[in-house]
């Protein structure tokens, strides 16, 4: 491998090897027929903690945003392989690739990526992105106030646990309760515009 390795993950009986500037896959059944094949030599993964199996594909953080392995392999390094174009401005200005963590919630078909700037003292201003697969497209929303040092997801005895560890030494559970770490959750709802027979009337 001619680039520093950032992550290894198994997907559909193939080992995907993510490096900083390349992506390869190791395919085969025995030592005699293992073959190292390039997925792309133009795009790599800067942070191994962003590599997740999501919605029947592998999603990772490339130099130009979130990408899927299938699109990257099919169309190379062109912009069409980037799935995060609608929220691309959220990734701009973050120069340290280590400032990310992620997790997947399969029963919600959600990929969550957090911008974990350790030097940011105001945790309430720390943001993240939720990516949801809907049909053949992706929808996005923004999180605020979560600054994880690590993340995990598990199902135990039929109960779903979405967890993250904070830099304050505590382990937090997401998707539970009706407040945010003791604070009231501010929510806004907007219904679809009602045409009322005239598109000029709202």
Give a label for each model feature.
Residues 15-40:
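Surface-exposed extracellular loop regions of Gram-negative outer-membrane beta-barrel proteins
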Residues 4-18:
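Active-site periphery "cap/insert" segments of enzyme catalytic domains
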Residues 3, 10, 36-57, 63-202:
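Beta-sheet repeat architectures centered on beta-propellers
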């Amino acid at each position: 491998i001619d680039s520093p390795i950032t992550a290894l993950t198994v997907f559909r009986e193939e080992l995907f090897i993510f490096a900083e500037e390349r992506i390869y896959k190791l395919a085969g059944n025995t030592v005699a027929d293992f073959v190292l094949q390039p997925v792309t030599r133009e795009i790599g993964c800067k942070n191994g903690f962003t590599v997740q199996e999501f919605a029947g594909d592998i999603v990772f953080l490339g130099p130009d945003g979130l990408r899927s392995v299938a699109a990257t392999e099919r169309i190379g390094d062109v912009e069409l392989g980037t799935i995060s174009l609608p929220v691309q401005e959220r990734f701009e200005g973050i120069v340290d690739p280590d400032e990310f963590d992620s997790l997947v919630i399969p029963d919600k078909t959600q990929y969550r990526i957090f911008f974990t700037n350790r030097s940011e003292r105001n945790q309430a201003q720390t943001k993240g992105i939720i990516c949801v697969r809907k049909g053949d497209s992706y929808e996005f929303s923004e999180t605020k106030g979560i600054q994880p040092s690590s993340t995990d997801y598990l199902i135990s005895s039929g109960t779903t646990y979405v967890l993250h560890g904070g830099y304050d030494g505590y382990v937090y559970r997401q998707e539970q309760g009706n407040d945010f770490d003791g604070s009231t959750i501010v929510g806004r709802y907007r219904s679809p515009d009602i045409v009322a027979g005239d598109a000029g009337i709202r």
